[in-house]
Structure formats: C-alpha cells, structure tokens
Amino acid sequence: MAEKLMKYADATKKYDVVFGLETHVELSTNTKLFCPAHIEFGGEPNTELTPVSLGLPGSLPVINKTAVDYAIKLGLALHCEIAEWSQFARKNYFYPDMPRDYQISQYDKPTNGNGYLDVELEDGTVFRVPIERAHIEDDAGKNTHVGGADGRIEGADHSLVDYNRAGVPLIEIVTKPIEGAGDRAPEIAGAYVRAIRDIVRALNISHARMEQGNMRADVNVSLRPSPDAPYGTRSETKNVNSFRGIEKTIQYEIRRQAARLDDGKEILQETRHWDEATQTTAGGRLKSDADDYRYFPDPDLVMLHITKEHIEEMKAQMPEMPRERRNRLKSEWGLSDLQMRDILNADALDLIEETVKAGAKAAGARKWWLGELSREANAKGVSLEELPITPADVAEVEKLIASGKLNDKLAKQTVEGVLKGEGTPDEVVKKHDYKIVEDNGAIEAAVDAAFEANPDVVEKLKSGNMKPMGVIIGAVMKATRGQADAKAVTKVVMGKIKG
C-alpha cells in the first residue's frame, strides 16, 4: 500500500529539514586493504581471495600503505584535521557478505575528522557542508538475490555471494547533520556528492563510478517543527547509487515523514531502500544506535601513526582541486556560468579540456561534446567517455574544418564514420573521399539546377526576400553530397540574382 505523502512545498514550509550523508568511496588501489588480493571490477566471482579476505582462522591483516596515503589526500581536500594517531576497530555484525562476522573500520579514532566542503549550487550560491569524519574501512562482499521480482532478498529463492569485493579499501565520508538547507536539501545533497566524485577523481584515488558500485551513499533524513527544536527521528536509506536517486530519496522522505507527523504517527528509526522503478523508499529493518555493533579496537592491528612530515609530503603531491580548475578553465575559455554548468552537467569537462590540449579551440570542442556526441551517447545509453571517439579525434576534425578541408556537414559525416569504427578522422575522410567542392563550374551547374527546380523561390530572392535562400543552398548541398563550400554557393547564388 502506497504511503501518504505531503506536497513538497508544504512539507518544507511546515517542518525544518535536517539531513546527512554517508558517502562510501572505493579506492582504486591495486590490492585490498589488509591483504595482497588483486582488485578487479566484474571479474570471475570468488577468484580474488586470500585467507584474510575470507576471515580464516590464524590469518592476520597488514595495512595497505597506498590506501592510507589516499585517505590523507582526501582529508586534505576536505579540510579535515588529520590525526597523528588513528585506530582500526571491529564493527561486529552477522551477514553472509561479511565472512569474518565483523568489518574492520574506524570508530572513535578516525584518520580524518572535523572538515568541510563548499559546494556550488545551480544559481551560484555556495553552501558549506560540515564533515564529521572520513575514515578508512574495508568493503563487504556482494550478495545477489536470485528468483525474486526486483533483485531484493524479499521473495528470492536463494542468494549467491561473491567475496571478490570483500576487503576492498573504502573511505566513508560522514557529514555532520546538515541544517539550514530548507527546500534546497535535495539540490545540496546532489551537488555535494558530485563534488566528492570530482575531488576523488582529481586526486586519482577512485574511479567513483556509481553505476559500478564503487561510490554509493546512505541518506539520512529527519524533520523537526523548527530550527531550535531537537532533532527528529531519522530514517536511513542505504546504498543509493545515483545522484538523481540521492536527490529523489531526500525529497520523498521529506514528503513521507511530513505526512506521518501531520497524522500524529511515529517516525521509525529504520533503514530503508530506494526503489528506482517506483521512485519510493521502502522500509527495511529497525535500526538502533552504533552500540549495536559492539565496536572495539582490532587487536591484530597496531595504531596508525601519521607524522607531520608525511602529511607535508602528501600536501606537496596535491593536484589542482576541481573548483579551482573550473574557475581557471571558465576564464581561459571565456565561458559564462551557464555554459560551464552545461559542461559539468554533461560530465564533459575532462573531455573538452583534452580536446583543447590536442589543438582544438574551446568553442569547437564544446560544440561537439555537448551536441552531436551527447546525443549519440544518450541514444546508446552510455557515457561520453564510453563512446568510440577520443578527444584527439575531435581535435583532428576541428583542424580539418579550420584548414578548409571539411565543412560542417562533412565534419558531421566524418565523426559518424569514426563512431562506426571506420578509423581515425583522416582515414574516414580518405575512405569516403570527403572534400569541399570549390570548382565554380560544378557549383554553378548545381545552382542552375536548383533555380530551375524552384522558380518560385528564385522570384522571391530576386524581389529581395532572402528568407528562402536556404532552399537553394540545401538543394546545392544535396546535389554535391554536402561537399560544396557554403560561402562559395552563396556567392554564386547572389551573383545570379543580381545579374
């Protein structure tokens, strides 16, 4: 039975929204956090295992130094205080994807704490998100529930477990309760998680592909009658794996909780699940406080000591951060805020920058990646990066246009050839013998034929009405297979009209 919902505008006027996010980022190390097992997305199930990742008796964990360095870099990017001494703890719970029956995480002594991230919203407003901690932990295995209607455990015939992911290093970034967002809570949440994605990619510490599960978020939402009232009971929607899903989860939970509070009903402290098909959250298990997990220091791991000298080494390796990079490129390329936002929304900044580095002008690169190539990616249901065309290819097409060897139509056909796997732009041009027709004799013959086929258009042109000029130019382009130079065609047409 569908839950009662309050209108979103009414809910955010009547109640003060408080939300929080726990963002799990899988680190792109070569091996797991506490053992030398290799990490590979989509590999054969249960092939990348060691006694440590299976939790076999007598196996002892050894920390992955690269994972620690990645955590330090992320802490620096999030303006965190980096602890000189931090500690791993056992988080105890029973579930089939956790063969040890505990997760190695950090509890009261995390590596990174007390940070913040400034996120820019659609209208240019900057909102500061407070960060409680960014701690290191290992991931669980992956359950696949077979036989049910929607892939969930309810209604499944049986479950399969792949332990390849067990032990993969994660950083969990936990915000403090985020207050003052009001009706912009979903937008702020989406902008924040996108900013985290951009930062970890810039640091080159994670692929951060939500569709592959190496970045996901738990979404906490509660309501209270006013900003000075105590926090309300929160729900926690687990493992939301899309930016849109995070935004929709917050919006739905605000509406659901507001309707329950209005009816005098209790808000349960529970875990919930976001259902993409129905665009709703569904209740899971009741959730108590962290004490349920019986955290205690892991006796197999000594405390982690990070010296000030090592932190300085990591600082020296920090790249330009995404926000500073965006502002620099916006200035270099002469873009408006709206134009830069279009690039970011299309996830095309890296591709456009690489195209410019390969020799194209920014305007031309932006035209291709946000236009023809975005349409192609949407039609195929893939990302721009997954298209079989490189920034160097796009730059080569732009150079062919600039040198006068291709017009816009031939350039489009060349790009289509590259996408079909016919080779590089130069190879496609040679294969199809694409070239601009500059022979005035051939152009004049095509114009004469177009005039003869469209006498009414010719009369309008001669009377000074230039609106139907496109009919003649289009006919000439069709006759020359798009190879005529548009400027040359226009010149011939104007000469014949005036003559």
From Swiss-Prot:
What keywords are annotated for this sequence in UniProt? ATP-binding, Ligase, Nucleotide-binding, Protein biosynthesis
The EC number(s) attached to this protein equal 6.3.5.-
Q: Which domain of life is it from?
A: Bacteria
Biological process GO annotation list?
Answer: glutaminyl-tRNAGln biosynthesis via transamidation; translation
Reactions performed catalytically: L-glutamyl-tRNA(Gln) + L-glutamine + ATP + H2O = L-glutaminyl-tRNA(Gln) + L-glutamate + ADP + phosphate + H(+); L-aspartyl-tRNA(Asn) + L-glutamine + ATP + H2O = L-asparaginyl-tRNA(Asn) + L-glutamate + ADP + phosphate + 2 H(+)
Q: Which GO terms describe its molecular function?
A: asparaginyl-tRNA synthase (glutamine-hydrolyzing) activity; ATP binding; glutaminyl-tRNA synthase (glutamine-hydrolyzing) activity
For whether the record's keyword set contains Protein biosynthesis, the answer is yes
Its protein name is: Aspartyl/glutamyl-tRNA(Asn/Gln) amidotransferase subunit B
